[in-house]
Curated annotation (Swiss-Prot):
Involved in the import of serine and threonine into the cell, with the concomitant import of sodium (symport system). Keywords: Amino-acid transport, Cell membrane, Membrane, Symport, Transmembrane, Transmembrane helix, Transport. It comes from Streptococcus pyogenes serotype M5 (strain Manfredo). It holds the Pfam family SDF. Belongs to the dicarboxylate/amino acid:cation symporter (DAACS) (TC 2.A.23) family. This is Serine/threonine transporter SstT. One of its GO terms (biological process) is threonine transport. The chain crosses the membrane at residues 17-37, 39-59, 75-95, 138-158, 179-199, 212-232, 287-307, 313-333. It catalyses: L-serine(in) + Na(+)(in) = L-serine(out) + Na(+)(out); L-threonine(in) + Na(+)(in) = L-threonine(out) + Na(+)(out).
Length: 404
C-alpha cells in the first residue's frame, strides 16, 4: 500500500487528472447508477469556490499594503490585453459565422425564471453597483468586483499600519494559499467525479443533434486559443509563445474545463503564476480581474449564437453591422460574470441589434443551454487559461524592455 501511495505522490498532478478523467468516463458509461459518487465533484468545486474569495481578498490586500512606491505591476498592459483579446475573439466568431453559416431549430423550452439584461447599460450598471457591495456580502456571494475593490481599499489603508499588522496580513495570505494547495491536490478525485456526473447524466450521444453548432463553437475557441492568442503573445514578447500557451492550457485550461467555473479556477491560476515565477503584486490583482472581464470565450458564444439566429430568420447583415456586433459582444462579455446565466443570457442584448424579439432570442438561449455541457466547459477553459497567458506575456514584455 505504501508503494502505491509513494508512486501516486511522485506522479505529476496533470497525469493524475488524466487518470481521473479516464476512470470517470469508464464509470459514467459502465456504472451510471452510482449517483452518490457525484458528491465528490460537488465538494471539490464547492471547496474551490469557498476559498477563492478569501484568497483574492488576502492576496490583494497583502500585495498592496506591502507595495513599495514605484514598483511595476504592468496592470495597464494586462487590462488592454484582456479587452483587446475579448474583442479579437468576438471578431473571429463573426468571421467563423460567415464561413460556416448556421441555422437553428427553435421552439426550445426556456427557463422562464431567467431574465436577461435589457441592454449594455444595464450590464454595466450592475457591475458598478457590485463595486460598492457590502464587503462581507461580496465575500459570501463571490462578487469578485466587490472583493477586489474592498481589498484594494483595505490594502491602501494598511500601508500606514505597523509592521506587525502587515506581517499578520502576510501570514493570513500564506495560510489561505496553503489551504488552496490542499484543495487543488484533490483535483484528480474531484474531476473524476465531475466527468462521471456529466457522462452518466447526459450520455455520450445526447448532443449529436447539435453537432455542427458544437463544432463551430469549439472550433472557434480552439482557433483563438492556438492561433489568435499566440499571435498576440508573439507581437508583445517577440519570442515563441507556444511553450507558454500550451502550459497555460494544460495546467489552467484543463482544470477550468471540468470545473466550468472561472471563480473556482482562480486558486489554480494563482498557483500556476507562482510556479511560472510571476510577480505576486501583479497576478494577485490580474487573475481575479481576468476572471471578471477577460471573456473571449463568452464573446465567441454570444456572436456565434446571435449570428446563427440572424441566419435562421434570414436577416441580411453587412460588414459594419457585424463590426458593431463584435463591439457589443465584447463589451457585453466583459460583464458576463455579473449576469446570472453568464454569456448565454447576454445573447438577447446582441440579438436586439437585428430587431429579434426577446421571446425568439430566449429560444436561442435555450439552444445554448442544451449545448452548454460542452460550450461552457470550453468557454471557461479559454477564458481562464488566457488570464495566466496575458499576465505572463505582459510581465515578460516589461522585463525585455528593461533589459533593452
Amino acid at each position: 500500500m505504501k508503494k502505491i501511495y509513494d508512486l501516486w505522490v511522485r506522479v505529476s498532478l496533470i497525469k493524475k487528472i488524466g487518470i481521473g478523467v479516464v476512470i470517470g468516463v469508464m464509470l459514467g458509461i459502465l456504472a451510471p447508477d452510482l449517483t452518490g459518487f457525484s458528491i465528490l465533484g460537488k465538494l471539490f468545486v464547492g471547496g474551490l469556490k469557498a476559498i477563492a474569495p478569501l484568497l483574492v481578498f488576502a492576496l490583494v490586500s497583502q500585495a498592496i499594503s506591502h507595495q513599495k512606491k514605484g514598483r511595476q505591476t504592468n496592470m495597464t498592459l494586462i487590462i488592454f490585453l484582456y479587452l483587446f483579446g475579448t474583442f479579437a475573439s468576438a471578431l473571429v466568431a463573426v468571421l467563423t459565422a460567415y464561413l460556416f453559416p448556421l441555422t437553428l431549430v427553435l421552439n426550445t423550452p426556456v427557463n422562464t425564471e431567467l431574465s436577461p439584461p435589457q441592454g449594455v447599460a444595464e450590464v454595466f450598471q450592475s457591475l458598478l453597483l457590485k463595486l460598492v457591495d457590502n464587503p462581507i456580502n461580496a465575500l459570501a456571494t463571490a462578487n469578485y468586483i466587490g472583493v477586489l475593490s474592498w481589498a484594494i481599499i483595505f490594502g491602501l489603508a494598511l500601508k500606514a499600519a505597523s509592521q506587525e499588522t502587515k506581517h499578520l496580513i502576510k501570514t493570513a495570505a500564506e495560510v489561505t494559499s496553503q489551504i488552496v494547495v490542499w484543495i487543488i491536490n484533490l483535483a484528480p478525485i474531484g474531476i473524476m467525479s465531475l466527468v462521471f456526473t456529466t457522462i452518466s447524466e447526459n450520455g455520450v450521444g445526447i448532443l449529436s443533434d447539435y453537432a455542427f453548432l458544437i463544432l463551430v463553437l469549439v472550433g472557434t475557441m480552439v482557433f483563438v486559443a492556438l492561433v489568435v492568442n499566440p499571435l498576440i503573445a508573439v507581437l508583445i514578447t517577440r519570442q515563441n509563445p507556444y511553450p507558454l500557451v500550451l502550459r497555460c492550457l494544460r495546467e489552467s485550461g484543463l482544470t477550468a474545463f471540468f470545473t466550468r467555473s472561472s471563480a473556482a479556477n482562480i486558486p489554480v491560476n494563482m498557483q500556476l503564476c507562482q510556479k511560472i515565477g510571476l510577480s505576486k503584486d501583479t497576478y494577485s490583482v490580474s487573475i481575479p480581474l481576468g476572471a471578471t472581464i477577460n471573456m473571449g470565450g463568452a464573446a465567441i458564444t454570444i456572436n456565434v449564437l446571435t449570428l446563427a439566429a440572424v441566419h435562421t430568420f434570414g436577416i441580411p447583415i453587412d460588414f459594419l453591422t457585424a463590426l458593431l456586433l463584435s463591439v457589443v459582444a465584447a463589451v457585453s462579455a466583459c460583464g458576463a460574470s455579473g449576469v446570472a446565466g453568464g454569456s448565454l443570457l447576454l445573447i438577447p442584448v446582441a440579438c436586439s441589434l437585428f430587431g429579434i424579439s426577446n421571446d425568439l432570442a430566449m429560444q436561442v438561449v435555450g439552444v445554448g443551454f442544451i449545448v452548454g455541457v460542452i460550450q461552457d466547459s470550453c468557454e471557461t477553459a479559454l477564458n481562464s487559461s488566457t488570464d495566466v497567458l496575458f499576465t505572463a506575456i505582459a510581465e515578460n514584455a516589461f522585463w525585455k524592455r528593461k533589459k533593452a
